[in-house]
Amino acid sequence: MKYRELGSTGLRVSEIGLGGEWLQRHTDAEVCAVFDACDECGINVVDSWLAAPDVRTRIGDALRGRRDRWVIEGHIAPTWQNGQYVCTRDLKYVEPAFRDLLDRLHTDFLDIGMVHYVDRPDELTEMLNGSPFMRYVQKLKSCGNIRHIGISTHNAAVAQMAAQSGEVDVILFSINPAFDMLPPSEDMSLYFADEYRSDVSGQIDPARARMYALCAQRGVGIHVMKAYAGGRLFDARTSPFGAALTPVQCLHYALTRPAVASVMVGCDTPAHVYAAAAYETASESDKDYASVLAAAPKHAYGGQCTYCGHCAPCPAGIDVAMVNKFTDLAALQPEVPDGVRSL
């Protein structure tokens, strides 16, 4: 495993990281097995925005006895209300949710306190102007409960503002070849629209390119989410390029962007961990994404869910992300897989 400096934080992180979002439906033993596989492969950084108490406990128990070897990136703003995830800046909910996170992870600090899901420039402006929420985050840093401040966003304009602010050390940003062709927006639906905007199709959006360069200049580290676009890039039928990319190609694309230190890969099983870590021994030809992109059509990216869960909470209590995931798994097969049918 190769390790990279995370901006100016002084942290060295494995270039393959663990995204914890798919651990929520697994047992204690299964979650522990994923962390065992990560240790075996040299992975030392985990990102988790999950608010559900049970999965926080499972991750914390899996980290017990190895906390000092792991860089933990935990999110501030996800809360658990009435059995559902709710993202809020209301300190009445945020403060107990953060204390709960530390307690369940069996630690008294997070290496990175990630301000969760900031996609609107006006919201970031309010935070940077000293909102109560941001004052709380800064207090956590001054007290040592978080060592570095991060922001997660899908919007390059927000990421650029964060990098320029001097307040943010790390940005968690969605990076893959498809998303790089889309314009910055606070409307996430554009990332899954039927077509790319014509003036950015086939080339990296200039705003995203500027943001990557600015982060490299300012020493702001980038962690990557959605490198696989929810698995859509692995199938020619769902890829905007009309041809499938491999996990290795997607990882290489993300890791060759300026300022990127690590890609957070969502892993259900040890096999997923090993598949991601195989990047480290892949040949240059295996990593070559350029040949696929060179033949990419200019338009027609069919809109699809990437199961991020940001549409929550559902008024009817439905786990929309998981319903969409299993629907898509079924639709890609001639018959409904047994594993989906049994759910």
Question: Which residue ranges define each predicted feature?
Answer:
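Active-site mouth loops of central-metabolism enzymes
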Residues: 19-29, 79-95, 124, 235-244
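Beta/alpha (TIM)-barrel catalytic core signal, keyed to glycine-rich beta->alpha loops juxtaposed to Asp/Glu
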Residues: 118-343
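Short amphipathic alpha-helices and their capping/turn segments at secondary-structure boundaries
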Residues: 2-7, 56-65, 94-105, 159-166, ...
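N-terminal binding-site loop/beta-alpha segment at the start of enzyme catalytic domains
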Residues: 1-76, 80, 108, 142
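Short, acidic/polar
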Residues: 25-38, 89-106, 153-161, 245-253
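Active-site groove signature of glycoside hydrolases
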Residues: 100-124
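Acidic-and-aromatic substrate-binding clefts and catalytic sites of carbohydrate-active enzymes
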Residues: 23-29, 47-57, 79-81, 88-89, ...
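Conserved, mostly hydrophobic/aromatic
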Residues: 6, 18, 38, 46, ...
